[in-house]
A protein has these predicted regions:
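Short beta-strand edge/turn micro-motifs at domain boundaries
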Residues: 107-109, 114-161
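Core segments of small alpha/beta cavity-forming domains
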Residues: 1-67
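Acidic, glycine-rich flexible loop segments
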Residues: 63-117
Length: 161
C-alpha cells in the first residue's frame, strides 16, 4: 500500500521513474470488459499527471500523497507528522478470488485527512506466481483531496528534492 503512495510522489517529481515504480507496485489492470468501471493504466497515468503535475490550479493537487500521511490535513496545509506514516485498516470483508491471477485479494482502507470520509479503499492481491503483494485497484488515491485553504502554500520539495 505504501509503495503506491511512494511511487505517486516519485511520479510527481520524476515522471519517467515514477511511472516505472507504479507499474512495479500494481497489477496489469488494463480495461476489463467485465468490469466497465475499471480504468486502464494509461487513463490512470493521465489522471495522475493532471492531479500531481498539472498546471490547472483548480484541479492539480501536488500535495495529494501528503494527505495520506498521518497528521496531514487540509487545515495544516497537509504537513504530516514525522516519522512519515501511512495508516491502513483492513475492511471487514472476506478475501475475494481473482481467477485471472489465480489469487485472493483483500481490500483495505487507507486513512486520509484530505477527504470527508477520512479514508479511501485500496485493493491488494498476491498473485500465485509472485512473492510480492501488488496493489490491484486504488481509485480513491487518484481522486482529488480537498484543496489547500487560501492562506496555505505547498512546499514542492517537502519529500523529494
Amino acid at each position: 500500500v505504501t509503495m503506491v503512495l511512494i511511487a505517486m510522489e516519485i511520479y510527481r517529481k520524476y515522471p519517467v521513474f515514477g511511472e516505472k515504480c507504479l507499474y512495479l507496485a500494481t497489477t496489469e489492470n488494463e480495461h476489463d470488459p467485465n468490469n466497465p468501471g475499471r480504468m486502464s493504466k494509461d487513463r490512470i497515468m493521465h489522471r495522475l499527471s493532471e492531479l500531481l503535475r498539472g498546471k490547472d490550479e483548480y484541479y492539480a493537487r501536488p500535495y495529494q500523497v501528503a494527505a495520506y500521511l498521518k497528521g496531514a490535513h487540509q487545515q495544516n496545509g497537509y504537513i504530516p507528522e514525522k516519522p512519515y506514516t501511512v495508516e491502513v485498516e483492513a475492511m471487514n470483508s472476506n478475501y475475494e478470488y481473482n481467477s485471472k491471477m489465480d489469487a485472493k485479494f483483500i481490500q483495505y482502507y487507507v486513512l486520509t485527512g484530505g477527504k470527508d470520509s477520512g479514508k479511501d479503499i485500496i485493493r491488494v492481491i498476491k498473485p500465485w506466481d509472485s512473492k510480492y503483494f501488488l496493489v490491484d485497484n486504488f481509485p480513491g488515491l487518484y481522486s482529488q483531496v480537498k484543496e489547500l485553504p487560501g492562506s496555505k502554500t505547498w512546499d514542492d520539495n517537502m519529500f523529494i528534492k
